[in-house]
Amino acid sequence: MRLRRPLIAVAGLAAAALALTACASGTTDETTSASDSVAGTGFPITIEHAFGETVVESAPERVATWGWGSTEAAISVGVYPVAVAEQSWTVGEGNLLPWVEEAYDAAGVEHPVVINDDEGGATIPYEEFIEAAPDLIIAPYSGLTEEQYDTLSDIAPVVAYPEAPWTTPWDETISITATALGLEAEGDAVLDEIHGYLADEAAAHPEFEGKTFAGVWDGDGLVYVYTEADPRISILTELGLEVAPSVAELDTTDGGFFYELSYEQLDKLDADFIVNYSSSQEEAEAFLTKPETQAIPAVAAGKVAQVYDPVTVSSVSPPTALSFDWAGGMPALVTAIAGVLAE
């Protein structure tokens, strides 16, 4: 199923491209206001988050994004950021995610500045943000520290995550982004379409109902088990799947999005099947054949849905407003799960 993108289907939103095109050159003197072409409403808007609240006084003209998913969320409601976070693990330094690049090209929008992020948000190149001159920074799914938030706030208002880093549900990332842009109704329309897609997939796969799973990443010596709070896991529950009780029993007190299991503890991970995320096919195959991972009952039984290579993993970790129907991503994962459960 191909989702209908607002940037393709709604001519009025395509005009938003002109509003934010000045980004790539780093100039600001001839930028058209986003509010001239995208009907953002309800300003000033107050967004509450983990570090307090942020007031967006008026429709932003130069949006920057940080972290994951907010770039796509903005584009899905017709706003093309002037600066976006680098996704170096997925596509290398200075490049755009393929579905993001496709969106800019389809709309005829000059590509944004790609802000260096080769350390997964551990450090922030503030000078690059200053040069991009944003009037709003959107980062609802990120790892911002309070110190980073405070420093970025000296550059522009910052919308941070609502509770804990890297745990904001995929749909909240979309709704928070749309709300901050004064486009809440447009965000709701995007969510309605995606939820409809998920409902259709669930209806097409009644065998998913009630089946338990765990999502893992093999760290070679230990296995990372994603918590139910992690969006790549919670999204799968919308298909009728259930997070295995053995995952919750691992428990963590740090509010993180994964648990760590040593190879000696892998027998604790009991589920109907495993979703294994890997950076390459070789790593994925090794996960199936290691003597240590055979302690996981589902692995020993061959009940493993594989997701590998950086682009594919990123497209579902978690899916974004633009990557839901990326051919090798969510549709392929659903097919893989169906295949595992049919065996």
Predicted regions mapped to residue ranges:
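Basic- and aromatic-lined ligand-binding clefts that recognize polyanionic substrates
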Residues: 62-65, 70-74, 187-247
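Extracytoplasmic substrate-binding proteins
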Residues: 53, 147-220, 319-343
